[in-house]
Design a protein with these regions (language model features):
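Generic beta-sheet signal
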Residues: 6-10, 76-84, 132, 156-160, ...
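Conserved helicase motor
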Residues: 57-64, 137-139
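Glycine/small-residue-rich loop that forms an oxyanion/phosphate-binding "nest" at active or ligand-binding sites
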Residues: 59, 67-116
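Class I SAM-dependent methyltransferase SAM-binding "motif I" and its flanking Rossmann-like core
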Residues: 97-154
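Short active-site oxyanion
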Residues: 28-34, 106-109, 157-158
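Glycine-rich, flexible N-terminal cofactor/catalytic loop recognition
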Residues: 1-60
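A contiguous loop/helix-start segment that scaffolds small-molecule binding in enzyme catalytic cores
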Residues: 78-79, 157, 161-225
């Protein structure tokens, strides 16, 4: 690891605590400060791998407020790592603003390769993976309809993140818009004990999830038009 000012973006496991690279562990042990989306969640990983560095919160509700002070600390020589609760930071998680500010101030940014939920879900879906588009989380209300309309016309495989309490609503809306026979794959609890991937049509998956209890974050992979 380079001992010069920079921001490291460090992917963390999406479930199994062993799914972290040796390089990521070295970086987390050697930086001055670790910025975490939720320090309570990240402390489990930190303790598991015997990392003793300072942990500070950096999340959607304080990133604007903390941005200037973090940039000043980086400019003064501090070395930081940004992690999310699970997976690669700044993908459907806080981090974009800090990365952009670092580039604007000529502060080096280095992103390590590592875990992210969308790629295992895509590969495991059996749907075309040579061309795909990642939409993240759909808006819960405002802008949801227009986003769904864009997905309707998409010829590439589409990947979405969704929470359990909104899944049935999302499947119903997508089925009505794209056709209930459109093929879809849903992965949940990736890398965990109860990992599950279900493939079928929107109609089949809606029926399945109406009769099965849901837990854990979900990845929806939809066949293109």
């Amino acid at each position: 690891m380079q001992r010069s000012t920079r921001l490291y973006l460090v992917p963390t496991p999406i479930g199994n605590l062993e799914d972290i690279t040796l390089r990521a562990l070295i970086v987390l042990k050697e930086v001055d400060t670790i910025l975490a989306e939720d320090t309570r969640t990240s402390s489990k990983l930190i303790k598991h791998h015997k990392i003793n560095n300072k942990l500070e919160s950096f999340h959607a509700f304080n990133e604007h407020k903390r941005l200037d002070s973090l940039i000043q600390r980086l400019k003064q020589g501090e070395i930081m790592a940004l992690i999310s609760d699970a997976g690669t930071p700044a993908i459907s998680d806080p981090g974009f603003l800090l990365v952009r500010a670092c580039h604007e101030q000529s502060i080096p940014v280095e992103c390590l390769p590592g875990a992210t939920a969308l790629i295992p879900a895509l590969v495991n879906s059996g749907l075309p993976s040579d061309r795909f588009v990642f939409e993240g989380f759909l808006p819960p209300k405002k802008g949801r309809k227009s986003r769904l309309e864009k997905i309707k016309e998409e010829s590439r495989t589409v990947i979405l993140y969704e929470s359990p309490h909104r899944l049935l609503k999302t499947l119903k809306q997508l089925g009505e818009l794209l056709g209930n026979d459109r093929q879809v794959s849903i992965s949940r609890e990736l890398t965990k004990l109860h990992e599950e991937t279900i493939n079928g049509s929107f109609e089949e998956l809606l029926d399945y999830y109406q009769n099965n209890t849901l837990k854990g974050e979900l990845v929806i992979v939809i066949a293109g038009k």
